[in-house]
Amino acid sequence: LNKELLDICYKKHNKEIDLTWEQLAQQYGFSSGECLRSWFKRIRRENGEIGYKNKTRILHISDNHYPFNLPKEVFKNYVGKVDVLVFGGDEQDCQSVSRFKKKYRVPFVDEMIGTRQMIIDIIEYIKPKQVKLIAGNHNYRLINYFSEKVHEDLLNLMPETNLDFIIDLGFWKHDHQSKSKTFYEPLTKVFDGKIDIEYMKNWWCKIGNTIFAHPKAFKSGILATTEKAYTYFLQLGEKFDTLCLSHTHHQGFSRYGKVYMYESGCLCEEPSYASEGTMIRPQDKGFVYLVQDEQGNLIYDESKLICL
């Protein structure tokens, strides 16, 4: 840190000298006066002298795996303090169309009804301004199941994930015994005019300079899956300063170069069907709270990985 330059900047800030920022920038090797002012402003922020304007507060939650989900009260410290709520995939377990034992399964439509209500309850509890949802590997279980049972021509009648039904399309539950049916409105209509809710129809999305992702790939080892995702997004040419990953059910944090990397953990009890003698590493419960400045850059000191 150039103490002489910092002293000069404070004098300029306090109007004790007549030099312009542009003149100071040329004198001390900065590309422009604006670049020097940004440097000085960053130093003052780091010293706690000034705050940030127009901050964006993001709560990233994932892997609820309804009906094994944790109660919404785990978010009690963030009620009314969130601008963007990101559901990072696997809100529903979709166990009835999985490969696991049938004795643990519940009807798929009932599970989807419960997942829909869980999402509504969380949104109404936290009260965010916007909601974004990305798809996890369990969200694709429905189309994977049908692709094995149904002719490929008929698959064109089906959306790819359960979130298409819950968020955008709505769905019916038919009771063939009583010959009745109930329609469950899509959440875009439930929250119409109240909260901006969007299903991204992809396994990742970008908000500011942060990438949120739920890959299908898994690599054992601490933050190994996140490091693989980091390389993948660099190869895509994406520019980002933060990577927040779902899927692994584990938590971790690291900084690689100038990029902050988080694994968010999960928000569910471990399904009993998935742990019968597999000797898998115990899962980590938690979520991630991120704060960005007006340019979408991470404010690290105000962001955190929450462990439950």
Placement of each model-derived feature along the sequence:
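Core catalytic region of metal-dependent phosphoesterases/phosphodiesterases
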Residues: 61, 66-178
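Active-site neighborhood of phospho(di)ester-bond hydrolases with catalytic His/Asp-centered motifs
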Residues: 60-62, 84-90, 132-137, 212-215, ...
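Short, basic interhelical loop/turn and adjoining N-cap
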Residues: 22, 26-41
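Active-site-proximal loop/helix segment associated with metal-binding centers of metalloenzymes
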Residues: 149-227, 266
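Beta-strand-turn-beta hairpins that frame and shape the catalytic cleft
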Residues: 51-59, 204-211, 256-259
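Short, solvent-exposed alpha-helical "recognition" segments
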Residues: 38-51
